[in-house]
Each structure stands twice: as C-alpha cells, then as structure tokens.
Amino acid sequence: MTEKINLLNLSEPELQGFIASQGQPLYRATQLLQWIHQRGVTDFSLMTDLSKPFRQQLSEASFVRVPELALERVSADGTHKWLFRLADNNKIETVFIPDRKRGTLCVSSQVGCALNCSFCATGKEGFNRNLTLAEIIGQVWLAARLLKSPYKITNVVMMGMGEPLLNYEAVVAAMHLMMHDHAYGLSKYRVTLSTSGVIPAMRRLREESPVSLAVSLHAPNDALRNVLIPLNKKYSLDQLIPLCRDYYSRGSKRCVTFEYVMIEGMNDRLIDAKRLIRLLADVPCKINLIPFNSFQGTAYRCSTESAISVFQKCLMDAGFNTRVRRTRGDDIAGACGQLAGQFHDRTGRHQRWVQKQGHDFNRPIPAIDH
C-alpha cells in the first residue's frame, strides 16, 4: 500500500507532480493551494469546488497535517509566542510581533541550532534536526489561524530557531509559498531571511529567491566575530562583506540589512562604531542595533541606553540608516535571542552534524584583545 503524502510538505512543483500522478488537470494544484493556505481547510470533504470522486481520491492518497499547539503566551506589548509540537515530539517556537500597521511573524527553520553563537540562547540547546517544509510553512498556517483581530501577518522573517541557509531547500520552498498569490501573497519585500553568513548558500539564494536579506554581523572585525559567531572562522568578513556589497544589482533600491547585537563592553564602544563604519564604507545597507537579551547562564549584559544612543549617532552621522530594534516580548521569553527550544539533545545528533561540516563550531575560544 502506498504511503499517504502530507500535501503541506510539497513545494508547488511537487504538488503539481502529485496532481498529475492522480490523473487530474494542473489547475487542481491551484485550488488546493487556495483551500489549504488561504482558507485554512485541511478536510478534503469541505473543499466543495472539487468533485466528490477527486475528494475521495485525495483522502485515500494524502492528508494535510500541521504542527500542534503546545503552548501560547501573550505579552503585555501584544507579542505572541507559540510553542509548537512536531510529530516526533520535538518543539519549536514561533513569535508574532505587532507594531502599528505591521505584524511580523518570526519563523524557525531548525530544531535548535548548531552554530553556537555565544550571545544566543537557542544555540546553547544544541542542534537536533532540520525542519521539513510542512513544519516551516505550518508555522505560518497556524499563526494566521491563531491570531485574533486586529492582528494580521504582514511580514515574515526567518529569524527564529536555527540557521535558515543550513536548511536551504525546505526554507526556500516555504518562502516561495509565503509569496505565492494563491497561498499567503506576501511581497518579496516583506519576506526576510536572516543568516549568520553561510557564503555558498547566500550566493545560491541570490540567484534563486527574491526575498530580502538580513545578515547577523554583530562585530566590526574577524577577531571579535570569531568569538560571537564561530561560523566566522569558516566564512570570514573578507568573504562576507564583498558578497553583501554586491548582493543586489547596481542601481537597485534594495540593500542588505545588518543586525548588530549590543553587548556591554564587548562590541558597543565608540571605537567599535568607527571600525564598523570603515568595514561597511562601500556597502549599501541598513543597520539594526539590537539590545542584548539576557538568558540563563550567560555572562553578557546589554549595553546601556546611553551607549546604544552614542553608537547609533556615530553611525548615522557617517550616513548609515540606523535604527534600534526595541526589545519585544521579553516578559514571555519571546525576544530575539531567547528562542531556546524546550528539548534536550540526548542523541548526539549535534556533534555528528558539526563533525560532518568539517569544522568544530563549539571549540573553546581563547580570550582576545579586540
């Protein structure tokens, strides 16, 4: 007996292939996209513009399954955080951040993260596995149905648990559905992928997906970035910055956004701002300064308001479009850097994955004078 297929786990071309295998015309794929993503219907018997024989055929060959809601918390500032349970009992977190007329959904791409960035809570939990397409787009599907008026998803950022470009195929397929007119219909300007700088995948993304790009920079030189983002030892700034400079075509109004977490005494001094100005001198970009969010076990502290203000002014005086991304949802552990998955890596998957990459991102790093 042929195993049933989760239609939520199919990209548009794969869905068309499935429809063809059922002897149906391709426009049925469009109808299914609309029923599943726009109307949120998962019961084939309710898809009334499909013939009864085809609905029966679908129920025998396929199903639609999204992650389960395990926990919901709502912050005083309107931020929503959901803990979703996957079929294998792993859990991921998704956050919705309302802001005036904008509603941004922060989506996870992996269970945990292997990069072990020293300022991020998620990395401390280790890496378990990549999410499937169904588990990524399922977060959007669920959030759209869980949110109550007046909240609405206008933007999606791939900034949740995990490094999106280390789960390339599933992430790009999910973003395509986010932008698809018959699914979620978001503009390419409203879907953003954030990466720590996986250079080969960034080059591929530039050619294959029109989404907006954000880069987790967080340091003005390699010495400090090696401490904050160990991936930098593999893909250093002399590779990353030229790619960011040329990521969008000349004359384009689009530019890369750099994210820079503000950590007291680590990367928030005036000399750090001046080094950052030199580093990005010829790079069309925007800069988001992110106050560090503390988590259990970290020795880092957030920069003071005055230090952040001085840092921002220095960058703006040099001509950089710079804003401070204010902390949201910190009363429910939903702010950036606090997306620690509630699981324990008992299987050794994390170390096996790291070894497969040929680089030990978790090797202890000696103290340096940056």
Curated annotation (Swiss-Prot):
Disulfide linkage: C106-C336
Residues reported to bind S-adenosyl-L-methionine: G162, E163, S194, S216, L217, H218, N293
Domain Radical SAM core stretches: 99-331
Coiled-coil annotated residue ranges, if any: none
MF-aspect GO terms: 4 iron, 4 sulfur cluster binding; metal ion binding; rRNA (adenine(2503)-C2-)-methyltransferase activity; rRNA binding; tRNA (adenine(37)-C2)-methyltransferase activity; tRNA binding
Gene symbol of the encoding locus: rlmN
Function: Specifically methylates position 2 of adenine 2503 in 23S rRNA and position 2 of adenine 37 in tRNAs. m2A2503 modification seems to play a crucial role in the proofreading step occurring at the peptidyl transferase center and thus would serve to optimize ribosomal fidelity.
Cofactor(s) demanded: [4Fe-4S] cluster
Protein name in the entry: Dual-specificity RNA methyltransferase RlmN
EC number: 2.1.1.192
Miscellaneous comment in the UniProt entry for this protein: Reaction proceeds by a ping-pong mechanism involving intermediate methylation of a conserved cysteine residue.
Keyword Transferase: yes
